[in-house]
Amino acid sequence: MKSILWLCVFGLLIATLFPVSWQMAIKSRLSSEDSETDQRLFESKRHSDAIFTEEYSKLLAKLALQKYLASILGSRTSPPPPSR
């Protein structure tokens, strides 16, 4: 009878200790996966920001060049002001 009681106590002790360690292992694995996912998202965001910045810089340069050429061609093709 005592052996059955000790067996039940030992089984209960084992059952309470192991699920806690399994949960801790799962949590640590999930947290490492979360940090990897966060890192990938950060790198992706930086990449898209760099692409946007590069394209925006090209657009600004193109607009500045168009404005400069328009000012040069406009001064060249406009008729001289009438003399009075």
UniProtKB/Swiss-Prot annotation:
GO cellular component: extracellular region
Pfam families on file: Hormone_2 (PF00123)
Coiled coil: none
Keyword Zinc recorded: no
Name of the protein in question: Exendin-2-long
Assigned keywords, A-Z: Cleavage on pair of basic residues, G-protein coupled receptor impairing toxin, Hypotensive agent, Secreted, Signal, Toxin
The record's account of how the chain is modified after translation: An amidated Pro-81 is described. Such an amidation is however not compatible with the sequence displayed. Indeed cDNAs do not encode a Gly that could serve as substrate for peptide alpha-amidation.
